[in-house]
UniProtKB/Swiss-Prot annotation:
Similarity remark: Belongs to the shikimate dehydrogenase family.
Name recorded for this polypeptide: Shikimate dehydrogenase (NADP(+))
HAMAP family, per database record: Shikimate_DH_AroE
Enzyme class: oxidoreductase
Role noted for this protein: Involved in the biosynthesis of the chorismate, which leads to the biosynthesis of aromatic amino acids. Catalyzes the reversible NADPH linked reduction of 3-dehydroshikimate (DHSA) to yield shikimate (SA).
Gene designation: aroE
An individual GO BP term: shikimate metabolic process
Pathway where this protein functions: Metabolic intermediate biosynthesis; chorismate biosynthesis; chorismate from D-erythrose 4-phosphate and phosphoenolpyruvate: step 4/7
Annotated Gene3D superfamilies: Leucine Dehydrogenase, chain A, domain 1 (3.40.50.10860), NAD(P)-binding Rossmann-like Domain (3.40.50.720)
Length: 278
């Protein structure tokens, strides 16, 4: 049960290792807002009842994480972004109506804007992976005006499904065709789990990328993946997964607490310290 002050929560199963409370409590302190942010471990069989009585639990809104993102879409009034991505990660009230959105799109684009200003000057991008994170990335790139997205996935059918969803600017390619797609691409994005701690590395020759290209990796454990290290070694600009995690939290905080926070170096250092091996 949340306190009577304005409060939000993260709903997941499991959710104990989330950094969301650290992020939101930092902003509450910095902005002098009386509020709270809790973790609610809710199993799938109890999710619908919990969400439908969110106000009764004392919350003005919530973040939603695995495995509830798709179900949250069905239980709320989703916006265009949540519908396009097929998942909701942020719930908020509009009067008594519970609405939902997906802030991964803003998180991805906001991180690029902060880490690599001018990244969108190139009309071409290459995106690796066709899962849920890829949907958010593709939506954001198209909305920003990218004209051609080469979408590589080991299962070409999943990439074709995203082309069917988002239109002809998305061009499905085989995984083996990635090297041929890199020349002229101003942005390379990894949305897969390759390179994550405990997963195989993502091994791609970046030599064909233009000298002013940007490389983004949604993985944030480790903070510097092999892909980002290779990009930096070539003098390319990079955007890591932690930046996206921080930027995606901004809109939810604004919706719940009525103030738009900033992603600062101090906040990043705080979360980096929490991520460091103990």
């Amino acid at each position: 049960m949340a306190a009577t002050k304005r409060a939000a929560c993260l709903i997941g199963w499991p959710a104990a290792h989330s950094r969301s409370p650290l992020i939101h409590h930092y902003w509450l302190r910095r902005l002098g807002i009386e509020g709270g942010y809790s973790i609610e471990a809710v199993p799938p069989e109890g999710f619908a009842e919990f969400v439908l009585h969110l106000k009764t639990h004392g919350y003005v809104g919530a973040n939603v994480t695995i495995p509830h993102k798709e179900r949250a879409l069905q239980l709320t009034e989703p916006d265009e972004r949540a519908r396009a991505v097929g998942a909701a990660n942020t719930l908020y009230y509009d009067g008594d109506l519970l609405r939902s959105t997906n802030t991964d799109i803003e998180g991805f684009i906001g991180n690029l804007d902060a880490s690599a200003p001018g990244w969108d000057r190139s009309p071409h991008a290459v995106v690796l992976g066709a899962g849920g994170s890829s949907r958010a990335v593709v939506f954001g790139l198209l909305e920003r005006g990218v004209q051609r997205i080469a979408l590589a996935n080991r299962s070409i059918e999943r990439a074709q499904a995203l082309r069917d969803l988002f239109g002809e600017r998305v061009v499905p390619i085989a995984w083996s065709d990635i090297p041929a797609a890199l020349p002229g691409a101003g942005l390379l994005v990894n949305t897969t789990s390759l390179g994550m701690k405990g997963q195989p590395p993502l091994q791609i020759d970046l030599s064909a990328l233009p000298a002013d290209a940007v490389v983004s990796d949604l993985v944030y454990v480790p903070l510097e993946t092999d892909l980002l290290a290779a990009a930096k070694a070539r003098g390319l600009r990079t955007a890591d997964g932690l930046g996206m995690l921080l930027h995606q939290a901004v809109r939810g905080f604004d919706l719940w607490f009525g103030a738009r926070p900033h992603v600062t170096a101090e906040l990043r250092a705080l979360v980096e310290a929490d991520l460091a091996p103990k």
